[in-house]
Amino acid sequence: MPKTIKKQNPSNTTLQYKKYLEQSKEKTAKAKNKDVSIDDLLKKPFLEEIKTNVLKKNKTTRASTATRGTSKVKKQIVESSIDFFDEKKRGVFIVPPAGTSVINDDRDDNKAVEETVSKTAISQNQLAHYANSELVETEQFELKPVALEHNQVLTSTRHSQERESIFEKAQLFWQIFVGDVRFGFWKNHTWIWLGFFDQHQNWYYFEVVETVELPQEHTAFIKRKQIDSCFWKPLVGNPNYGYIQNNIWVWKGFFDTKLNWIPDPVRFTLPMVEKATTTTPVVQIELPAPPTVTVVDQTSPPTAAVTVSTSQPVIEEQTTVFNQTTQLEQLSVSAPLLDQSEVETEMVEVPFVAPSTTTTQPQVVTVQAQPASSSIQFQEPIIKVEFVNESFDFKKPSQTAAAASQAPSQAINIALNEADLIDELVAVGTTATTALPQSELIQEVVVIDNGQPQQAGFHYVVDFLTSTAPLTVAEIELQEQELVNEFVTTTSRETTTFASTPVFEPVVIPTVESEEQLLENEFVESTVVSATSNEPNVASTPVVETVELTETPVSLEPLETVQLETAPVVTETVTVTEKAVEPEVLAVVEEAPLAVEPIVETSTTLAAETVEEAQVEQESTAVAVEPAIETESKATSEAQAELDWEALIGNSEYGYFDAEQNWIWTGYFDEDNKWVSTATAQTEANAEEVVLTADAETSELNTESDPSFEPEVEIQPEPEPNFDLETIPEPESIETTEPEPNFEPEVELEPEIEPNFESETEVQQELAQESSFESEPEPNFETEVEVQPESEIESKFEAEVQSEPKVSLNSDFETKPEAQAEVTPETLEVEATSEAPELQPETEATKVVDDVEEEQLDWELLIGNSNYGHYEPSGEWVWAGYFDDNQIWTPDASVEWARESDYTDLIGDEIYGRYNRKGEWIWYGYYDETGEWVLVDEHYQNHQPRISEAPRFWEQLIGNEDYGYYEDNEWKWYDGEFDSEGNWLVFHSSNAEDAKNIDIAKDIPVFESFDVDSIDADEWLDQFSDSDAKEVFGED
């Protein structure tokens, strides 16, 4: 602890020490001016803002007990997070010394006890009495050592972290109370709180209504129509809205969405803990009557000296426990006052305080304890003090030789929180913790002589403006009206704290890139199933099923004959069981001819897992079968390259557009990208599937083959054409045969009874009567096509039939040739007699394509053809006619008048057209020469055409405030209209209130001398004749 130096040589005094003395003299001179009062000081602008926080603190004094006399206990609640402001507008927090609980936790059962001297106990008269009194010898007193129990010491670092964490949590809850009339009210776009919240989120109402100076600067921004998003920038630096701390602007509140200012109601209250008493005191303390102390104020006249006598009572409810194993020596302390002549040359060493957080050394008193069995008696030392220039200089406490010889000295740390004048007994209980010092100057004299480690305690200075220099207690301006010019010089311990600047680094979210396989020409599924083997071909009997149709028969067209041979890809299995045919089932049935429905023959897919399942031996050759086509695997060239089928959209050979402008394919591409037409007659939805199996035994047609088995077949439905060329396996060979469309075969068939085949799959057949019909089949299934080339087909009817329809096993399309057949149970042989007509198959796909070309024309191919239109100089194509409902071109010169500038605005209007799947705009009609809409598409004949509008000259006036205004980003016209000549006419209101505001005298000067309200218009108009009206208004 730095020692007090008396009469130090001024030449050795540091510059900082001199500056400190000059500041002390200046403040002393200001305080001695009786004309300057605290009310005058509070008239300063910066103090007016904190007037209520400094002077109107809630103070309560508890009544003293009978044994305590004039001792008082203060219980105060600091209502502001700032203890006080200095003359430099800097807010100062006073932090309690170590051992004092920072937060008053209600859950803590142990209450801290504080016994201190009231700052009002030493009045001005007492100080004067002390100044004029002489040194009074201190009386000896005895102490009994007892055990002391101290609370845990809190470090400054822990305290600062706890305070910051409390502040961050405290400002999250109070925003929900904004607008609640129980907590405040609105005034001039500012929320006024009726109280405050402490750090524990407890609400306290103000006991005295505070005269809060409301900030008014932000109200000017609210009255503006268009508010700038950076309106708050001019408010930075305004003390009504915040303060600067460490060169950072800190707001005292926030603005809501309506720009209302809402201040922060959180205040860190530091309550003085209540005194705890014990029902059974451990030690009884008896003290003699205290001596009389006289103090004379040297700054006052001699007549102002007053003698005051005070007595110190015995505190029975307090208990002091000391270590009984240690005996303290008796101590005699004297501190003589300085002479008046030594005032000017007085030099007191003050330790240098760095600009950081400092700690305050609490009072430590060294006393002597004597053993006693029942009680401990304390006797207070009397100190003679001379108050000079607000600074004190004490002699080092002296100890008598007699007291030192009695017992070894022992220092006891009482752990007081303030530097107090020892003018009364301070008794500390077992849970001795002190409360926070108040935000006033301390008026007591301290005698400190202790070699024990100092306890933690510091002043924490918050700089709200620009200065960062720390303050000591001696630099604080007068805070209470009863205070004069005294201040306390105490030892201090420097503690330096550094606040680390947080470094924010951007958080990078790792991204994982995954490759996605691009699928081009994706197929839904592959419907091609084949089973090839090197084993000999298996002969099978055809199974024909008749289906009744309600539609009119349509003639068939010749079909393509395609042969392809694929690799052994087996995805589905068919079990074929060889069974003998029962001859009694094959009876000839002769019935009356009936109307024969078209026979629908469908292709099937025959797949076998193994070659053994597909091999069937013939047990009977007596039954004749329908001519079968030999299917033989042959090597072909390698697979062709992938086909860009999207380029074929629009080609009439591959499909057509329907009424909805959707492209419809008339076939599909096989494994080798060969086009296969599947245009067949569309049947009823309930038409049953027909299984057709054929077996080629030799290269020639066999008419005598015994149906010895009926294989179990599985029919696959035909999906939508979806060409995924990657999923189709490459065939081993392919051979195609072009159909001959010039033949229309007519086959005579006899009714046939279905043979009874014993197998897992039983196919029922219907008898077909002899009839002639035509049908137009539709594709129903997609299966693998495997046919023989035309060059290898030989028929015994070659002389009579020039060509025959070619049927393949596992065909990918349905073969439905127009037939007139005679079927018998015994034989399916085609009769080659003169009665049998020639087989003339038609190419059905070619006919369908022709129909598609008639139904849908690719008019885009006609653009540029001078027979259909011409190009404008601007490069626009203008049609010279239109296509009617039957897609027939109708030349019409009247459509040439339409230009792009006339119908561009109509593109996108569903009344005049639509977009197809390609994104092209399709018109429903056209405008004729008269400008009227002519509807062409009958499907949209119910749509009403748009009425042609006048030139939109008024669009240029949108945005002109003379004609309207914007409301919610929507332009609204004033109450008016344009006449036929384009003049703007405003409608005036006919309300009586508006009529009263009209000054008729301005429009009609004749009425200037008349009372307009009393004039009868009819009576006034009667004085004019018709000729007068014509002269004024004209003949009309």
Swiss-Prot record:
Pfam families: EAGR_box. InterPro entries: EAGR_box, EAGR_sf. Sequence repeats lie at residues 718-723, 738-743, 776-781. It comes from the Bacteria. NCBIfam families: EAGR_box (TIGR03834). The keyword Repeat applies. Coiled coil: none annotated. It comes from Mycoplasma pneumoniae (strain ATCC 29342 / M129 / Subtype 1) (Mycoplasmoides pneumoniae). Residues 697-727, 757-784, 798-845 are annotated as: Disordered. Keywords: Cell projection, Repeat. Protein cytoskeleton-associated which plays a role in gliding motility and perhaps also in mucociliary clearance. Residues 707-727, 773-784 have a biased composition (Acidic residues). It is found in: Cell projection, Attachment organelle. Disruption phenotype: Has impaired gliding motility, glides at a slower speed and with longer resting periods than wild-type. Binds equally well to erythrocytes and a human lung adenocarcinoma cell line, but colonizes mucin-producing cells less well than wild-type cells. This is Protein P200. Residues 718-781 are annotated as: 3 X 6 AA repeats of E-P-E-P-N-F. One of its GO terms (cellular component) is attachment organelle.
